[in-house]
Amino acid sequence: MPTEYTNLVSALADTGYPCAEYGWKTRPDGTYLVVGLDYEAGRQEGDGAKQDRSFSVSVDAFFAKLSDRAAVAGKVEAALASCLGDSWELNSIQHETETGLFHIEWVGEVFGTITAPPEPEGDA
């Protein structure tokens, strides 16, 4: 994984809010965070391997009380700024009627290399 991404995951974990990569099987009570990196795992190109150099990252914060928005956003944005510099932006703020939670999403870009593993040779 790109270093900026792993640093961001650590920084988000340090906010004091539960944080998971790619979602939760059972949603935590209270405020929680979800972070994810978008890339095409296992895709093969060219000489048998694909190397991407930049990746989209998303951070989602979920919380029950609108009054918590400033505190949550402040901690998440501080983590984003320290790990991604200026390569992020606020994407959306919404209230989800199904869960009753407020949801803020930030998106950004991280740089690095993820090399897809080569396909196994021979018959499996």
Task: Provide a role label for each language-model segment.
Residues 37-57, 111-124:
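Long, continuous compositionally biased terminal/linker segments
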